[in-house]
Amino acid sequence: LFNIEMVRAIMEGRKTVTRRAVKLPYHPGDILWVRETWNGDWCDHYIYKADGGSAKAAGYAAEPKWRPSIHMPREAARLFLRVTDVRVERLQDINLIAVWDRTIKPADLHLYGWDANPWIQVIEFERISKDEALGGEGGRGRTTEGAG
């Protein structure tokens, strides 16, 4: 972490701080695909549990075995996001505008160290079309596996 010169500076009291670059997983311009609980068949017909509709209404004889979002292939994705901003902030710095959009429920704040006020990464995004995400005409655009 420190070279010899820096170790000496620490020992002599001349160095009391260090800075390191934060390595964030996403950057503005990255395209994410959203994985979700899903089911698909051999003819590329996909249904999504988030729709809340009946599987029978989608043509299934019975309720399908839902597949976990972690196993969703990109070709089954229907939601694509372009990252517009990435930053770090303190948990308690969530502003009133962002309160409605936070992932952490007020009842669960104790689980995430609210009182400790940890640093969190904030990823802002905009929804884009599948065609735009894949580079038009069904081409393969630059996409990054997104959270499920």
Question: PLM features: what roles do these ranges have?
Answer:
Residues 1-148:
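Secondary-structure transition motif
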